[in-house]
Curated annotation (Swiss-Prot):
The C-terminal KXD/E motif functions as a Golgi retention signal, certainly through the binding to the COP1 coatomer. The keyword Phosphoprotein does not apply. Belongs to the nonaspanin (TM9SF) (TC 9.A.2) family. It is a multi-pass membrane protein. It comes from the Eukaryota. Keywords: Endosome, Golgi apparatus, Membrane, Signal, Transmembrane, Transmembrane helix. Residues 26-230, 325-326, 388-398, 475-486, 544-554 are lumenal. PANTHER family: TRANSMEMBRANE 9 SUPERFAMILY MEMBER 4, TRANSMEMBRANE 9 SUPERFAMILY PROTEIN. This is Transmembrane 9 superfamily member 4. The keyword Signal applies. InterPro entries: EMP70, MFS_trans_sf. Coiled coil: none annotated.
């Protein structure tokens, strides 16, 4: 039983190392001689404003001078929607060409209509040359001041200009341009003969091979962009300082009597009448309802927090450099699988501390709490992608691989973690004895209820990260490159601190109002930032992006719902743990009968 998870874990580590560094491992061997064939791969095409809606290159009626060969791809590349095939253009090392004919094709009326439709939707293509990405638009629409789309003119770019930079025997950079002098008019519904041609120019450069990917990260590191990012951090730090001062004031108020007691040794302090949070010391550690669900949420949240920490560590050491195809998706799948034991251990140990008896059910609930909604969402969205015949639709073989990872690694580690948590012989540490009968909670003002407090708890952490959210969204759901992982790590740390502080403060106010049911409230308040992020999704979609269509809309809101749900669990766990430490601390400082 122990050997199987160990072997599968080693297999996953190998898969991870293979998946996150295909460019590094290949690039070290990419030395060419004059005339060597350097493969050019066509990846995908799609509407520029709908990044999830991409199709195979040859789904459009392009021609090819040779049989199309598919490139074998890693797991992360497939999850990223990459489908690389050999392109019709031949770019030998240091081989210059001038208006070379790649292939010829007579477009039928259906082909012309298809090209005209994609040109109207601003379709672009993406290719890779020696693992360097290049893009270009398929054509253009000439409106000439006319407002009726039936009067527009549609042109297909049939000539590409490749400008390639090299350093000794290595390819350093490639630029592709469409030539406005080579256009094919596709306005009318008639057959058209098209010659797809290209020009190749080689230029020498002093840029070393190790720095050839740096140009893709320069855009996000421009001074005016950095100023915005640093302003975001300063704004967040001010929020943290205000909250820290606010919390310090609360703690001073809470422990004021104890400071007086220890400073002046006055016995009269012990005899004063208990009020507020002291009055409910016999109920504050009464175990909550639905403790199995609470423990499962804490287990899943702990796993997701661990996953986020590892992802940031990999980002800071440079694994997720621009256009390292599929590295992030590979890392997410592998690290999530390997950290499932943390979820099982955390959930089962806490559940048993709360005197739970059905730990098997608790472990199953933990494993399905996040994966269940994710599976349902994926099944729906993958069906949509299949209906659209988009590259986002996962092949059956990839689905089998993911299922095997779940069956052979995720589930066994989850169960082993649950067994370890169950066997952890520790009782819940409660400084005060719980009374036999629960105390009645007095009526609360509207602003002390759950929903208003969730709104307050989510707004402050969200205000600390909302500036950075735009750049993240523009990178994930657009074509902007995000590489400032150090700043993102600082923002994430601030998010964690603010979430913990604001949840502790609201927990104190709840206890001061003699409301002892703080367990679920602290988790809901901590996780409410996820709801604010999802509300930002609505704003971003309608006000800051040009996304459209059923597929792109469903992918955006579907996967963002899963991401925000993950943030809810992770930040809710942080808020609960901070509140638990705070509650234990303040009740240790009083004398409990």
């Amino acid at each position: 039983m122990v050997l199987l998870p160990s072997m599968t874990s080693l297999l996953l580590v190998f898969l991870f190392l293979y998946g996150v560094s295909p460019v590094i491992s290949d690039g070290s061997d990419h030395r060419y001689k004059v005339g060597d064939d350097v493969p050019l791969y066509a990846n995908k095409v799609g509407p520029f404003h709908n990044p999830s809606e991409t199709y195979r290159y040859f789904d459009l009626p392009f021609c090819s001078s040779a049989p199309v060969k598919e490139k074998k791809e890693a797991l992360g590349e497939v999850l990223n929607g990459d489908r690389l095939v050999s392109a019709p253009y031949k770019l030998e090392f240091l081989g210059e060409k001038n208006s070379e004919v790649a292939c010829r094709k007579r477009l039928s009326r259906e082909d012309v209509a298809k090209f005209r439709d994609v040109i109207a939707k601003d379709y672009y293509f993406q290719m890779y040359y020696d693992d360097l990405p290049i893009w270009g638009f398929l054509g253009k629409v000439v409106k000439e001041g006319k407002t009726d789309p039936s009067e527009y003119k549609y042109y297909l770019f049939n000539h590409l200009q490749f400008e390639i930079f090299y350093n000794k025997d290595r390819v350093i950079e490639i630029i592709v341009r469409t030539d406005q002098n080579f256009l094919v008019d596709l306005t009318e519904d008639k057959e058209v003969q098209v010659d797809f041609t290209y020009t190749v120019r080689w230029k020498e450069t002093e840029i070393p091979f190790e720095k050839r990917m740096e140009k893709y990260s320069l855009a996000s590191s421009m001074p005016h962009h950095l100023e915005i990012h640093w302003f975001s951090i300063i704004n967040s730090c001010v929020t943290v300082l205000l909250l820290t001062g606010f919390l310090a004031t609360i703690l001073m108020r809470v422990l004021k009597n104890d400071f007086v007691k220890y400073a002046h040794d006055e016995e009269a302090v012990d005899d004063q009448e208990e009020t507020g949070w002291k009055l409910i010391h016999g109920d504050v550690f009464r175990f909550p309802k639905h403790k199995s669900l609470l423990a499962a949420a804490l287990g899943s949240g702990t796993q997701l927090f661990t996953l986020a920490v590892f992802i940031f560590m990999l980002a800071l050491v440079g694994v997720f450099y621009p256009y390292n195809r599929g590295a992030l998706f590979t890392a997410l799948v592998v690290i999530y699988a390997l950290t499932s034991g943390i979820a099982g251990y955390t959930a089962a140990s806490f559940y048993c501390q709360l005197e739970g008896t059905n730990w098997v059910r608790n472990v199953i609930l933990t494993g399905s709490l996040f994966c269940g909604p994710l599976l349902i969402t994926f099944s729906f969205l993958n069906t949509v992608a299949i209906a659209y015949q988009a590259t986002a639709a996962l092949p059956f073989g990839t689905i089998v691989v993911i299922f095997l990872i779940w069956a052979l690694v995720t589930s066994p580690l989850l169960i082993l973690g649950g067994i370890a948590g169950k066997n952890r012989k520790s009782e819940f540490q409660a400084p005060c004895r719980t009374t036999k009968y629960p105390r009645e909670i007095p009526p609360m003002r509207w602003y002390r209820r759950t929903l208003p407090q969730m709104a307050m708890a989510g707004f402050l952490p969200f205000s600390a990260i909302y500036i950075e959210l735009y750049y993240i969204f523009a990178s994930v759901w657009g074509h902007r490159i995000y590489t400032i992982y150090s700043i993102l790590s600082i923002v994430f740390l601030i998010l964690v601190i603010v979430t913990a502080f604001i949840t502790v403060a609201l927990t104190y106010f709840q206890l001061a109002a003699e409301d002892h049911e703080w367990w679920w409230r602290s988790l809901l308040c901590g996780g409410s930032t996820g709801l604010f992020i999802y509300a930002y999704c609505l704003y971003y979609y309608y006000a800051r992006s040009d996304m459209s269509g059923f597929m792109q809309t469903s992918f955006f809101f579907g996967y963002m719902a899963c991401i925000c749900y993950g943030f809810f669990l992770m930040l809710g766990t942080i808020g609960f743990c901070a509140s638990l430490l705070f509650v234990r601390h303040i009740y240790r400082s009083i004398k409990c009968e």
